[in-house]
Design a protein with these regions (language model features):
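Conserved RNA-binding domains used in RNP assembly and mRNA/RNA metabolism
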Residues: 219-302
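Charged, low-complexity, helix-prone segments enriched in Lys/Glu/Asp/Gln
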Residues: 91, 95, 126, 146, ...
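Short, hydrophobic secondary-structure boundary micro-motifs
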Residues: 82-85, 168-170, 220-221
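GST-like domain detector, emphasizing the conserved glutathione-binding G-site
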Residues: 1-129, 136-137, 266-270, 277-302
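Short linear motifs at secondary-structure transitions and domain/linker junctions
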Residues: 29-40, 154-157, 228-232, 253-256
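GST-like fold's C-terminal all-alpha helical module
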Residues: 98-213
């Protein structure tokens, strides 16, 4: 059984980011396929309420959000690095651009373009996730503007590649490539007509093909039931708590995203740093697990 389990589904753009990172590192991992829409009972048993994809599981440690998954992969499996030129902080900060600004443009283009072809069950699910409207008609009206915005964003990548480099930071692939690739992969996969926004930009097509050719590492299929059994039989890692969180140490807290998908996760604070927050919780199916969240984009309340 692979040590790394990735709870994912094939069409998830954020899962694709992590799959590319696994490919860069050449890691073996288990794909635990989750439903695209709720309910997701096995995933919720592990996370305590967090429903977004992907989630990485290593034993009884559950890592939520792609930004923290990247950090944990690099910590546990440092070579080959996702930061071949260093610049760790700067490159990780690019996720705030790709995961928010560029991703929102991609969502509007894809679902605005698909329009009435988007299943009603999917719309209802995403409205529950967002806590607001998922209006494909409004997205459709915004498509011309968003196509222009997307082209301008991708033109920055073309500018970076203009000196003939193989990948965005040099001759070796890294997180900058995975971050910048997945939204374009998402558009190509979900709504190919929109690739006209970037296909004619110089260097982009060849770079996309080079990133695609990296692959996804060594993948095996793992059932959701098997993943739960692994969690139940494992012991989570111990942690330390940062000074700024000392008042919450050993106490019940609530963690929630501050953008969308704000489902609260409750547990005892057992670890934190400038980069993460960890809570221990008990589940009748999954057993004792520690659920880890990134610090950026998440709130902690007592």
């Amino acid at each position: 059984m692979p040590e790394i389990l990735l709870h994912q589904y094939a069409s998830s753009p954020f899962a694709e980011k992590i799959r590319v990172c696994l490919g860069i590192k050449g890691l073996a991992w288990g794909a635990v396929d989750e439903p695209v829409i709720m309910p997701k009972p096995e995933l919720i048993a592990l996370t305590g309420g967090y429903r977004r994809i992907p989630v990485m599981q290593i034993g009884a440690d559950i890592y939520c959000d792609s930004q923290l998954i990247v950090r944990e992969l690099e910590r546990r499996f440092p070579e080959p690095t996702l930061f071949p030129t260093g610049d760790r902080g700067l490159i990780q900060a690019t996720a705030l651009w790709t995961d928010r600004v560029v991703f929102q443009a991609a969502v509007a283009i894809i679902f605005g373009g698909l329009g009435d072809n988007v299943p009603s069950a999917f719309i209802k699910d995403r409205e529950a996730l967002r806590g607001g409207s998922f209006d494909t008609a409004s997205m459709g009206a915004a498509v011309p503007h968003m196509m222009g915005q997307l082209r301008a964003h991708v033109a920055l990548l073309a500018e970076q590649l203009a000196d003939g480099r193989t990948f965005l930071t040099g001759e070796r692939p890294g997180l900058a490539d995975a971050n910048s690739y997945y939204n374009l992969w998402f558009i190509r996969s979900a709504y190919p007509p929109a690739t006209t926004a970037f296909d004619q930009l110089p260097h982009i097509g060849d770079w996309l093909e080079r990133v695609r050719a990296i692959g996804h590492g060594e993948r095996a299929e793992v059932s959701r039931e098997a993943a739960l059994d692994i969690a139940h039989k494992s012991e989570p890692l111990a942690g330390t708590i940062a000074t700024q969180d000392a008042k919450h140490a050993g106490k019940q807290v609530t963690i929630a995203a501050d953008d969308y998908g704000r489902d609260q996760v409750c547990g005892v604070l057992v670890g934190s740093s400038e980069h993460h927050i960890s809570v221990r919780r008990e589940d009748p199916i999954a057993g004792q697990v520690v659920v880890h969240f990134p610090r950026i984009g998440y709130s902690i309340d007592s």
